[in-house]
Regions:
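Sec-type signal peptide cleavage vicinity
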Residues: 2-6, 17-302
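Sec-dependent N-terminal signal peptides
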Residues: 6-12
Length: 302
C-alpha cells in the first residue's frame, strides 16, 4: 500500500526561506556569531640581535617576543588585552584571549591595531613614546622600546599582524684616534634631544659590547650644528655636531662610527636603515676647538 507524504504549505515555505538564508550567508561571507574567535599570529619585529658579547636576556628591541606577555588589541571602537604566546624561537607569537575574545562575523578582512606597552589605567589609548633617561643598564634600554601595528588588514584565512618599532635605535661604535690608544671605559651620551611628551633631553647609552653603545629615542629631528653625541673619556669631554639635520624615524637604526681624537671627534661613517643595518652616508666633523678648565680637564667641541 502506498503512502503519500503531504507537506503543509506553511512548512514548505519555511524550508524555502531557510534555503535562501543559507545561500545568502554563503554569498556575503557571514559566519555564525560566537563560533570563530579572533586568534592572530604576530610577526614583523626585526631579528637583528644585540652583539654576541651582550647578556642573553631577550626583548622586543632584539626582535624577540620573549619579554612581551600581552598587548592591547583594538577592533572597531573596543580595546581588549590579548595574551602573547611566543613561538619556540621567540621570533613570532600568537595573540589570543580566553574570555570574551573578539569573534569573526564574516570571512571578510578586519582592521586591527595593537600596541605594547600599554597603560593599565587606560588601555584604550596608545601611550606616547617615552624612553628612559639612563639606558646604561640592559633592562632600562630594553624597556624603552615601544611596538605597534596600526590599522592593519587581517585576513580570515591568514590572520597575521605585522608589528614595527615606534622608537629609533642609535648605535655608536667608538675607535681610538690621534692621542688615544684605547677608548675603553668611555661614557657615551646623546644630547640636544626633544623633550616632547616628557622625554629626556639627554640619554646615557647602554654599553652593548666592547666599544659599541646603544640607545632608543622617540622619533625626532636633531638640528644641524647642535651637539648630538657626547663622549666622556679620561678627563676629556668630546662632542660630535652633525653638519646636517639628524632625522630619527621610528623603526630605523642609525649606526655611527666615531673616532676619538685629542682634538675632537671624527665621524668615520653613518649607516641609516631599518632596525637591521642598511644603506647610508659618511663624512667628517669639523674641528671647532677646545677649552681647558682650571682643574686641567678639557672640553673639545666638534
Amino acid at each position: 500500500m502506498r503512502h503519500r507524504l503531504f507537506i503543509p504549505a506553511a512548512t514548505a515555505l519555511l524550508f524555502a526561506l531557510a534555503a535562501c538564508t543559507q545561500d545568502e550567508l554563503a554569498g556575503d561571507n557571514r559566519l555564525p556569531e560566537g563560533e570563530y574567535p579572533v586568534v592572530i599570529r604576530a610577526t614583523g619585529l626585526s631579528v637583528e640581535a644585540t652583539p654576541l658579547a651582550a647578556p642573553s636576556t631577550r626583548a622586543s628591541v632584539d626582535g624577540d617576543w620573549q619579554g612581551v606577555t600581552s598587548v592591547a588589541l583594538k577592533m572597531g571602537d573596543a580595546v581588549k588585552e590579548y595574551t602573547v604566546t611566543a613561538s619556540t624561537d621567540f621570533k613570532s607569537a600568537t595573540l589570543s584571549r580566553e574570555n570574551d575574545p573578539y569573534y569573526w562575523t564574516s570571512r571578510d578582512p578586519i582592521t586591527i591595531s595593537a600596541w605594547w606597552p600599554f597603560n593599565n589605567a587606560d588601555i584604550t589609548q596608545m601611550p606616547a613614546v617615552k624612553v628612559a633617561e639612563d639606558q646604561s643598564k640592559l633592562a632600562d634600554f630594553q624597556n624603552s622600546d615601544f611596538i605597534s601595528a596600526e590599522n592593519r588588514k587581517v585576513e580570515f584565512n591568514n590572520p597575521t599582524l605585522e608589528f614595527t618599532h615606534r622608537t629609533a635605535r642609535v648605535t655608536i661604535e667608538l675607535k681610538p684616534g690621534t692621542g688615544f690608544t684605547s677608548v675603553a671605559g668611555a661614557t657615551v651620551i646623546l644630547v640636544s634631544l626633544s623633550a616632547d611628551n616628557g622625554n629626556p633631553t639627554a640619554i646615557k647609552t647602554y654599553n652593548a659590547s666592547g666599544n659599541t653603545y646603544e640607545a632608543l629615542t622617540a622619533p625626532q629631528t636633531v638640528a644641524a650644528g647642535k651637539p648630538f653625541i657626547r663622549v666622556e673619556l679620561g678627563s676629556g669631554t668630546f662632542y660630535f655636531r652633525p653638519q646636517n639635520n639628524v632625522v630619527l624615524e621610528a623603526g630605523n637604526r642609525y649606526k655611527y662610527t666615531v673616532k676619538v681624537n685629542a682634538t675632537g671627534l671624527t665621524l668615520e661613517g653613518c649607516t641609516i636603515g631599518d632596525w637591521a643595518d642598511g644603506g647610508g652616508e659618511s663624512g667628517e666633523a669639523e674641528d671647532l676647538g677646545y677649552s681647558i678648565q682650571n682643574d686641567g680637564s678639557y672640553t673639545v667641541y666638534n
